[in-house]
Amino acid sequence: VDLSEEMLAVARRKIEKQGLEERIMLEKGDAENLSMVATDSIDAVTVAFGVRNFENIERGLSEIYRTLKPGGKLVVLEFSMPKNRLIRWVYSQYAHRLLPRIGGMISKDKQAYTYLPDSVEEFPTPERFSDMLRAVGFSRVKARSQSFGIAYIYEATK
């Protein structure tokens, strides 16, 4: 599910290239309102760098939980603020000073690269996000640090 038809087109091409059209379903829509998806009907959901863009994270997670079959898996890859002070400082310098300049020059959209670090800083800590997953009903919640804590992979089971 994605709001962007362009992102879905990219996904379709990749799915076709791998011959997975019969196994993967794509829908244009809002992850916080999955009314087009039946309850207990999905085997797995993956989200890469998208949960922090939800307007209401709890609502989005609840919808994902509703659509997953019992035993279904959720895997989320999301940015995070590193816990180590030195790494956090280096990351913040890069994200707030260098990234908007370089990204703005390449894409001509500096605002998008200003939004990115702000949204990362506002995203819940790994502990808090894990608690949010449990609060909507997920079990076997795991959070694994990647790249010195700049990103995390979260796994959860319905």
Q: What is the predicted function of each stretch?
A:
Residues D43-I57, S80:
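A short SAM/SAH-binding and catalytic strip from SAM-dependent methyltransferases
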Residues S130, V136-K158:
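Core SAM-dependent methyltransferase catalytic element
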